[in-house]
Amino acid sequence: MRKRYNIMLMSCLAFLATVPCQGLSKKERVVKKQIRPIIEAMSVRDKVAQLVFVDVYPGGDSAFQAKADSIIAKEQVGGIILMEGNIARTAETCNRSQSLVKVPLAVTIDGEFGLGMRISEFRKYPRQGVLAGLPDDGLMYEMGRQIARDMRSMKIDVNFAPVVDVNLHPDVNTIKDRSFGPDKNLVADYGSAVMRGMQDGGVVACAKHFPGHGDTEVDSHKALPVLKFPKERLDSVELYPFRRLIKDGVEMVMVGHLLVPVLDTLPASVSKVVVTDLLRKKMKFRGLIITDALGMEGVLEPFGGSGAKATLAAYKAGVDILLMPDNVSESIDLIVDYIGDDRRKLKDLDARVSRVLALKGTCGKLTGRDDLSVDPAAVDTKGTDALITTIEETLAAGR
């Protein structure tokens, strides 16, 4: 059943809001039935809040945790992204966060090199630039499967990986060894392998940073990078791995805070030309589209530092998930005001909420509260330890 997971979720994401139940599989019909009453009971503000994912810090102090709890409880957001902590504190944070909401949260993590990137007891896999030295992509698939096992044991639904940026100039590029390197075919092959491993294991993978952060000298955390090349280059290099992963069934794409002058005068993450016209329509991506973190300077800069205005612009561009907006309450208010009682905008909102709820339903988050609790005793790091050892030995043998 796990090998059919990615096929079922992509089908749900693409068609749940529009296809009659008779045309869906049994699993999809169950998810659709779970979603319908949830959406019908929601106000417009409730629906917008489902598109907002906020950060939680299991290793943070009590004051920070209290602030995060307050936002989750008050706004009833749709998901969380886990930051640094250990297994016990992360489990406690997940369980407490779930207890604060009526509609269960999607739980996500930025684990480019496994859970060890955020959870202290796990070893870290080598960076993607190092993994590019493996003789083939077989171990990349196994790595994806093991990451999924680890994440499912902690009830984590989404991993914001792999990075499929093509890094043509590693000496000056900000992505550096987060990328598989300068060969677009290897980036696509290895990125697809780890993506398929995760999704076959029941975790949603996320290709990033669309349309390509691999040839930029500026860090989008600090300023707005500019991709200064023609459409032909963008299409043949930067977009190539994304096109491959979309073909291979990736369920989520993260849009970066990147300025692409040949496409638009706005950053990609807030550009309808990039998000809707290019990714959704031209490249025919039917899955979930998420922004990079909305508190980064690369996206705040064009809006005079206003996180709420940047978040509204991202919504207008067509993204499904708004990641880590600076001011959650104000951001939701602006989007609700923008939608108003416009029937077309309300229908579009329902479609986006349906995609987010379909993610939760397919990951088992809508079946009952017993399925939400994380048990630290059920988490085992041995599988990761063994696989990392195998990977390191394989890399050493190839030198």
Predicted segment positions?
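A substrate-binding/cap region within the structured catalytic cores of diverse enzymes
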Residues: G133-I156, A161-G191, M195, Q199
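Second-shell residues forming the walls of enzyme active-site clefts
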Residues: S43, I80, R89-L105, L115-M117, ...
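Hydrophobic h-region of N-terminal signal peptides that target proteins for export
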Residues: L13-C21
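Active-site-adjacent structural elements in enzyme catalytic domains
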Residues: I87-P104, D137-K155, S354
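Bacterial N-terminal signal peptides that target proteins for export
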Residues: M1-M8
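Preference for extracellular/luminal or secreted protein segments
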Residues: R2, C21-S70, K272, K281-K282, ...
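A short aromatic-anchored loop/beta-hairpin motif
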Residues: A73-I87
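Short glycine-enriched loops at secondary-structure junctions
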Residues: V56-G60, V107-M117, D157-N167, A207-H213, ...
